[in-house]
């Protein structure tokens, strides 16, 4: 009798564990799909995608890949462009953090805590700078920032900020996301802006075929224009 009671108690627990593992596997796979399918990756900037949306985009993308006139090999270029977005965003976040540390927290470059934070961010940036795809004639990202005092190029900014800004750039120099105005800045963020290069200078050599790929893929899945899925052509200078 006691053995039967023990068996009954074990069964619900085992079922819950199995069910949890199954849900975890499903969620893990859906997260991977969201990072793999280009259109799902592009839409994640506007908020979290529903599971059904990710599955629908995956089906549409696979259909487009298997269509006879899909331009083979271009998907790598599309994913490389998304990698560019990531590197640029990481660089922008690093600049804002340094601006916060030096203006709000009043840290100096000689502070141990400041140096440790910056060294950690730089180490992660170098790891992320490794090319994921074959070279596409793009300038190599340079994350080798050095701790140094502020130079005349950065009037009005603290010494720590000069460590993060490329030549001629200041905090908040570049709009993000590309093609859209920056959201209202936090009190510690500068609103200074600099002119962006002309469109011909902004576009990397492979953007022309990329635009054709976007239009072809979106036409196949029933969207007439790339902006229908919030997929904007990058309007920012190359990652420095």
From Swiss-Prot:
Keyword annotations from UniProtKB, A to Z: Acetylation, Developmental protein, Differentiation, DNA-binding, Neurogenesis, Nucleus, Repressor, Transcription, Transcription regulation
Modified residues (N6-acetyllysine): 48
InterPro entries in the cross-refs: bHLH_dom, HES_HEY, HLH_DNA-bd_sf, Orange_dom
One example GO MF annotation: RNA polymerase II cis-regulatory region sequence-specific DNA binding
Keyword Glycosyltransferase (UniProt): no
Disruption phenotype: Death between 2 and 5 weeks of age. The mesencephalic GABAergic progenitors in these animals fail to develop into neurons.
Occurrences of domain bHLH (ranges): 10-65
GO cellular component: nucleus; transcription regulator complex
Any one biological process term the GO annotation gives: GABAergic neuron differentiation
Function: Transcriptional repressor which binds preferentially to the canonical E box sequence 5'-CACGCG-3'. Required for the development of GABAergic neurons.
Assembly with partners or alone: Self-associates. Interacts with HES5 and HEY2.
Protein name, per record: Hairy and enhancer of split-related protein HELT
Organism, as annotated: Mus musculus (Mouse)
Gene from which this protein is expressed: Helt
